């Protein structure tokens, strides 16, 4: 009788790969090309084997079907092209680090896309996200899952069929901008005890259709559902700053968690091609409106990180925009907060991955995360063994930084989801 290999010699990813029966070749394609990187990231967070199985099974059941038909390269005549990543992939991975020994978490971002997206059957790509959320509502393990905020904000900030017909008739969309109609995407936080679902909305289409300025549209929709649980003065300070400094545009995003309203934060996102320290400082302090000790301590940490990374400063948009992507920013407000929590997303794609990794390693050590700092570059190479870090510019997509009095330094690093499709410049 032949000997049996020890079951402990196989990882959860390898075990699942052996026995998975895929509904279609499309879903098998994405499992083969993207699940292994996700498995490596999950292990990086010191998840238990049971959690690895759980999260990978969730990825198979509820993430891949959102885009399984989609291919991450140009397809002539395709009616819809994803806009959530610079690599052209419809999904993105990130790891959040906070209080490093206890709190590291993987997040998966995805744009739900039906096969009919961009066609007469689903012209503004609404179908798939509704289908996904309806299915998630039946998953018993998602104990905190709640659709109240989705139902409200999807109506308040996304277009109806009538509004879309009006937009098409008036031709207010730039014809050359293939992702101009995109209005939503999703995120999945792989937390210790369950998966938390996040929604991201882009309200510019609703603003165009209704003729309502974005500042007014966002303020009204937030007050209508949160009433006074989101501090009105804090929200007004952020909205007024963004409005007065021309920060509301087609790239403005709004997000919330699909959990009970009393617990869900809200976030406002934007982008700016002025990738300079002075611009980052202005965004961090909300135009100088917040200069308290916590804000300024966070700013000092951000400056330290900024100086360690090979950032290319740009005051204006270069001719080859894709090679010099924008800086992103966000403001998070939780129920009861009297100040917003700023977050700066430093563009990592198109920067040398070895230099980025070295800069991050140094920063992690300086803030007391010695183990992470010592292991970071080796871990990155182990996830992408076929990539030469000295030549690669595709593995890091964003490096996000935040700081709060309660949590201290909070880092979120975004990565290419599949080395099979590296971003070529």
From Swiss-Prot:
Single GO MF descriptor: transferase activity, transferring alkyl or aryl (other than methyl) groups
Binding of L-tryptophan, residues: 83-84, 92
Signal peptide span: none
Keyword presence, Transferase: yes
Pathway connected to this protein: Secondary metabolite biosynthesis
Pfam families assigned: Trp_DMAT (PF11991)
Record InterPro entries: Aro_prenylTrfase, Aro_prenylTrfase_DMATS, DMATS-type_fun
EC annotation from Swiss-Prot or TrEMBL: 2.5.1.-
Binding site for substrate: 107, 198, 200, 265, 267, 269, 345, 410, 414
Highest rank taxon of the organism: Eukaryota
Listed GO biological process terms: alkaloid metabolic process
CDD domains (alphabetical): PT-DMATS_CymD
Subunit-level organization: Homodimer.
Family recorded in the similarity comment: Belongs to the tryptophan dimethylallyltransferase family.
Function noted in UniProt: Aromatic prenyl transferase; part of the gene cluster that mediates the biosynthesis of the indole diterpenes penitrems. The geranylgeranyl diphosphate (GGPP) synthase penG catalyzes the first step in penitrem biosynthesis via conversion of farnesyl pyrophosphate and isopentyl pyrophosphate into geranylgeranyl pyrophosphate (GGPP). Condensation of indole-3-glycerol phosphate with GGPP by the prenyl transferase penC then forms 3-geranylgeranylindole (3-GGI).
Name of the protein in its database record: Aromatic prenyl transferase PC-22
